[in-house]
Amino acid sequence: MSALPPTALALAEQLIARASVTPEDAGCQALVVQRLQAQGFDCHTLESGPDDFRVTNLWAVRRGRSADGFTLVFAGHTDVVPTGPLERWTSDPFVPSHRDGRLYGRGAADMKTSIACMVVAIEEFVAAYPRHAGSIALLLTSDEEGPALDGTTQVVRWLQARGERLDGCIVGEPTSVNAVGDMIKNGRRGSLSGRLVVQGVQGHIAYPHLAKNPIHAVAPALAELVQVVWDGGNEHFPPTSWQVSNLHAGTGASNVIPGEAVVDFNFRFSTESTPETLQQRLAAVLDRHGLQYTIDWTLGGRPFLTRPGSLTEALGSAILQVTGRTTELSTTGGTSDGRFIATVCPQVVECGPVNASIHQIDEHVAVAEIEPLKEIYRSTLERLVA
């Protein structure tokens, strides 16, 4: 077995230096595989997707001595969002840079630092507990920031086919608000999107009696939908939200009544609602307004919730030990790959660095919070797997 590894900071810098914009992995997972194989991990690289959007996935596992031991999975993504205008960055987004006690680079917060902390925590844990009772696994994908069709969801199907048992999973999403460990996510709302196409009759704007304006037709329905209380939420989730993201209509000419209007919208829904009930209720409003329409629905993910149990207790205790903070359980924010893992794993929790700069110009993490995050992951391993 190799000697103790370099710091999580050094590994984070190596990962940031790889320009892995979705769906590219740019060698990030190969670097991780090299390190984990040295620790006795069985590594499987799984590629999927069409030729013009090839996704790289990784499943790595180190079995424990006990068949009944706790299997803890660390999950993350090696892909990052595009940089945006390079001229607005203070330094090259794919050259890790240090300023004011911060590590800068695309993926620094979301989520290459988390991956580095996971890997080094695993290495240190295996060195200290080479005959650990439970099992340790790592799941990585290069398709989380994109359509997420060929990433974690494909690995989950593969795991199901193999009959793998997972007991708990920590997703390294940047969940912290002001300081590392102050908030973790024990669930996420569901996401249901729709594209509504309302049919009208195109015509000259001076002869409205010979046309049918779809904008005028849909406007009262939209006004009603904005006012609907879809549910009241519950102790774990805020009320379901319905938001319009895009409106499209018109030919660009100022004297033409359009023939159709397109409305893109999204539900972020709690466990008090289902995709089916939301679809039915929205259609009822549209029908009541007498619209001629079609809707294409896309279910991004159903809500999931991990109630307090062995994983939240171990992670919360680790955070308290390392930082002195009592963490807050939350389900706010967007979706993550936790929604896919939750279909095969009874306990899924997200824990990572401060999220204030994610997806932004000059993305960064505080260097002083990298080692504590690694220690949180290692302490959780000790509590569940040793």
Swiss-Prot record:
The active site is at D79, E144 (proton acceptor). It holds the Pfam family M20_dimer. The keyword Amino-acid biosynthesis applies. Its EC number is 3.5.1.18. Disulfide bonds: none annotated. InterPro entries: Bact_exopeptidase_dim_dom (IPR036264), DapE_proteobac (IPR005941), Peptidase_M20 (IPR002933), Peptidase_M20_dimer (IPR011650), Peptidase_M20A (IPR050072). It catalyses: N-succinyl-(2S,6S)-2,6-diaminopimelate + H2O = (2S,6S)-2,6-diaminopimelate + succinate. Pathway: Amino-acid biosynthesis; L-lysine biosynthesis via DAP pathway; LL-2,6-diaminopimelate from (S)-tetrahydrodipicolinate (succinylase route): step 3/3. Zn(2+) 1 binds at H77, D110, E173. Keywords: Amino-acid biosynthesis, Cobalt, Diaminopimelate biosynthesis, Hydrolase, Lysine biosynthesis, Metal-binding, Zinc. Its cofactor is Zn(2+); Co(2+). One of its GO terms (molecular function) is cobalt ion binding. One of its GO terms (biological process) is L-arginine biosynthetic process. Binds 2 Zn(2+) or Co(2+) ions per subunit. Zn(2+) 2 binds at D110, E145, H359. Homodimer. Belongs to the peptidase M20A family. DapE subfamily. NCBIfam families: dapE_proteo, PRK13009.1. Catalyzes the hydrolysis of N-succinyl-L,L-diaminopimelic acid (SDAP), forming succinate and LL-2,6-diaminopimelate (DAP), an intermediate involved in the bacterial biosynthesis of lysine and meso-diaminopimelic acid, an essential component of bacterial cell walls. This is Succinyl-diaminopimelate desuccinylase. It comes from Methylibium petroleiphilum (strain ATCC BAA-1232 / LMG 22953 / PM1).
